[in-house]
């Protein structure tokens, strides 16, 4: 009986020691945990961004942080004691703003110095026809979103005939054919051919739409409206 009591007492004492040690370890760990503000400051300084959200995990061992900087939005997991970064994943990339047409033209002229003879644009790709001082002509394509030159190819004399006329030239042709004043001109593709549709205001308060082949400059159709 006495032996049994001693065994139980010893087991109880051992369990108590384990509980006390565990409590002390947890307490010490919690005392060493850095504050949210401290961890946030370190993360912002390290990655030159702004922390928009920071929460501590249930076990108090890590901080889950949302960071935004010029490169995008990141989900960061930081150690609560050392503030070391345990993991970092970009969840959203920043979509850079596209360059202006003036900036795109400047980039094209950097690649091929000369005089811009014609310029067209489809979506985010601007195309420039540039003539150099030696008389050679090049077609330069610029990706305005990526801010890079896609291609810069010399145009042969035969290919130059395929270069579209400008919007200004299309308006002049429409005015000459109708005797009115061109209001607007849109470049569209029809059955594989580029067509300028030019809206013209006529002297008798009427309007007309003139369709012009963008390659040849010939009038394909004129529609008069009341």
Curated annotation (Swiss-Prot):
Cystine pairings recorded for this chain: none
Membrane-related topology note: Single-pass membrane protein
Predominant place of localization: membrane
GO cellular component: plasma membrane
Keyword annotations: Cell membrane, Membrane, Transmembrane, Transmembrane helix
Membrane spanning residue stretches: 5-25
Official protein name in the record: Uncharacterized membrane protein YkoI
UniProt lineage: Bacteria, Bacillati, Bacillota, Bacilli, Bacillales
